[in-house]
Amino acid sequence: MTLTKRIIPCIDVDVDENGDAAVYTGVNFEDLEYTGDPVEMAKAYNESGADEFVFLDITASAEGRETMLDTVSAVADEVFIPLTVGGGIRTRADIKETLRAGADKVSINSGAIAEPDLINEGAAAFGSQCIVISVDARRRFDSEGEHYTEVDGESCWFECTVKGGREGTGLDVIEWATEAEERGAGELFVNSIDADGTKDGYDIPLMKAVCDTVSTPVIASSGCGSPEDMEEVFVDAGADAGLAASIFHFGEYSIAETKEYLDSKGIPVRL
């Protein structure tokens, strides 16, 4: 049986100047602009035909604070499709509290790189299906990597970054994806700093490299500018889900239009 490809909208949430949760959109993890209210946007996406929904607290890890659980709870009250929440999750207790607030899955990046055993502990306590390992990847054109890919005629490797892309780790994405899968991650959520917000398409070399390495489902993120970009990441890279933000936030394409296009190309989606 062919599994359907999932279409997933995502909101990047930060604290605004009044201390309230707000959705922001940026480019290359920078130049953030106010986009809307997280609860209202969640409600709209719940009714849009989305397969899942992702809520990312984009500064919790960098600022060393806890995830906005009150906002997560308010969003969960409006969302009746699987909800993944990420940002600031560092401990088993954080996982438990985030799930208790209404998340179906947690997305962990910096916390898992700092304490890889958190993946094992989370999978054992809550089930692998709850543990999504997020990777913020950045291209590097030097000799310090483990696994190299041809990109625009040059050889590059992909580095894991942490704290919202602010810090490099020296850790090769392919090595980390393999380890995360072995430790019990139920999904991999792969972001590209180079493609983020550009609407020029997903980072296909990155996504293909990860998809070719692991059997765990891969959510492709960053760079989607059209339904054609989703077709490309499904067909050419082998991703299991396509995540997008700005093209949906600003009404450039609807989720229904995206699914209809993919269906017309023979890509299995839930209509």
Curated annotation (Swiss-Prot):
Pathway(s) this gene product operates in, as recorded in its UniProt entry: Amino-acid biosynthesis; L-histidine biosynthesis; L-histidine from 5-phospho-alpha-D-ribose 1-diphosphate: step 5/9
Source superkingdom: Archaea
InterPro entries recorded: Aldolase_TIM (IPR013785), His_biosynth (IPR006062), HisF (IPR004651), IGPS_HisA/HisF (IPR050064), RibuloseP-bd_barrel (IPR011060)
Reaction catalysed by this enzyme: 5-[(5-phospho-1-deoxy-D-ribulos-1-ylimino)methylamino]-1-(5-phospho-beta-D-ribosyl)imidazole-4-carboxamide + L-glutamine = D-erythro-1-(imidazol-4-yl)glycerol 3-phosphate + 5-amino-1-(5-phospho-beta-D-ribosyl)imidazole-4-carboxamide + L-glutamate + H(+)
GO molecular function: imidazoleglycerol-phosphate synthase activity; lyase activity
Subcellular location as annotated: Cytoplasm
Name of the protein in question: Imidazole glycerol phosphate synthase subunit HisF
Organism field: Haloarcula marismortui (strain ATCC 43049 / DSM 3752 / JCM 8966 / VKM B-1809)
Phylogenetic classification of the source organism: Archaea, Methanobacteriati, Methanobacteriota, Stenosarchaea group, Halobacteria
Primary gene name: hisF
